[in-house]
Swiss-Prot record:
Its EC number is 1.8.5.-. Part of the MsrPQ system that repairs oxidized periplasmic proteins containing methionine sulfoxide residues (Met-O), using respiratory chain electrons. Thus protects these proteins from oxidative-stress damage caused by reactive species of oxygen and chlorine generated by the host defense mechanisms. MsrPQ is essential for the maintenance of envelope integrity under bleach stress, rescuing a wide series of structurally unrelated periplasmic proteins from methionine oxidation. It is an enzyme of class 1 (oxidoreductase). Keywords: Metal-binding, Molybdenum, Oxidoreductase, Periplasm, Signal. One of its GO terms (molecular function) is metal ion binding. HAMAP family: MsrP. Predicted to be exported by the Tat system. The position of the signal peptide cleavage has not been experimentally proven. This is Protein-methionine-sulfoxide reductase catalytic subunit MsrP. Residues 1-54 form the signal peptide. Heterodimer of a catalytic subunit (MsrP) and a heme-binding subunit (MsrQ). Binds 1 Mo-molybdopterin (Mo-MPT) cofactor per subunit. It catalyses: L-methionyl-[protein] + a quinone + H2O = L-methionyl-(S)-S-oxide-[protein] + a quinol; L-methionyl-[protein] + a quinone + H2O = L-methionyl-(R)-S-oxide-[protein] + a quinol.
Length: 305
């Protein structure tokens, strides 16, 4: 059976246990592949440094998590990814890790699934002002990066999404400069909260949620957590990122969740948790300030937004 990773979260923060286990057999998008029983049984049981959620947090349904998405490669409406992502072929799949490393390497998704997996129940805060709580399955990004033996020149890490317009119909439109690109500083990448997710609710990722592998950085706005990754490149200079290239005035490189720094067109002081009627206050760093604020000590977070 699935060994759920204990964390400082209340039972009300995720979908109820009965729903969770009844849903474990849903098929993961077009690939239709479940994480193996051996993989599930191997989920780590040790604690991780996760912050507590507020007592009034309410669960998100599996339906919400898999039907309310931003994934412009499949369309710009929230329902488009669930409707259109069946066209994505998530197998075979590989991720190239190159740049400032001892030896570049291409990993198959099967090789990546051999990393010790664990469940991480994280908040997700979208820059648009809505949020969810999601139980991801994945492994620390740092474990992959350490294996690559970065050089001393590796100051940043660039990520790239698959570009395949035949399977990603949104890429046929010039909504963004495809492929989708994101980036982090190397110390952000090495932080234990940053993970590469390969599943949710104990199953392989549905296509609309970023199959077969995506980044999850819970203290940043959701667009930083790039989906359907095909390349991870370590480099000396700050990488170009898609939304920053599209509108640098509205989307900064760091994009840490910050209720004191508004988007030019709306406030970031509060958020709407999907499934709730009333808004709630947004927490600095999405509630993970105790763990990550030290990464930005001495920085002007208004200037470096």
């Amino acid at each position: 059976m699935l060994i759920r990773k204990p964390a400082d979260h209340l039972p009300s923060e995720i979908t109820s246990e009965s729903v969770y286990f009844n849903r474990r057999q849903f098929m993961a998008g077009a690939a239709g592949l479940l994480l193996s029983a051996e993989t599930l049984a191997g989920l780590a049981a040790k604690k991780s440094p996760l912050s507590q959620l507020a007592a009034n947090d309410k669960p998100n349904s599996l339906k919400d998590i898999t039907s309310y998405n931003n994934f412009y490669e499949f369309g710009t409406d929230k329902s488009d990814p669930a409707e259109n992502a069946h066209t994505l072929r998530a197998r075979p799949w590989s991720v190239l890790v190159d740049g400032e490393v001892a030896k570049p390497r291409r990993f198959s998704i099967e090789e990546l699934l051999k990393f010790p997996l664990e469940e991480r129940v994280y908040r997700l805060r979208c820059v648009e002002g809505w949020s969810m709580v999601i139980p991801w399955v994945g492994f620390p990004l740092a474990s992959l990066i350490k294996q690559m033996n970065p050089t001393s020149r590796a100051k940043y890490v660039a990520f790239e999404t698959l570009q395949r317009p035949s399977e990603m119909p949104g890429q046929r439109q010039a909504v963004l400069d495809w492929p989708y690109r994101e980036g982090l500083r190397i110390d952000e990448v090495m932080h234990p909260l940053a993970i590469l997710a390969v599943g949710l609710y104990g199953n392989a990722l549905p296509n609309q949620n970023g199959a077969p592998i995506r980044l999850v950085v819970p203290w940043k706005y959701g667009f930083k957590s790039i989906k359907s990754i095909v390349r991870i490149r370590l480099q000396e200079t700050m990488p170009a990122t898609s939304w920053n290239m599209a509108n640098a005035h509205e989307y900064g490189f760091y994009s840490n969740v910050n209720p004191d720094v508004d988007h030019p067109r709306w406030s970031q002081a509060s958020e709407r948790r999907i499934g709730e009627f009333f808004k709630r206050k947004t927490l600095p760093f999405n509630g993970y300030a105790e763990q990550v604020a030290g990464l930005y000590r001495g920085m002007d977070l208004r200037k470096n937004f």
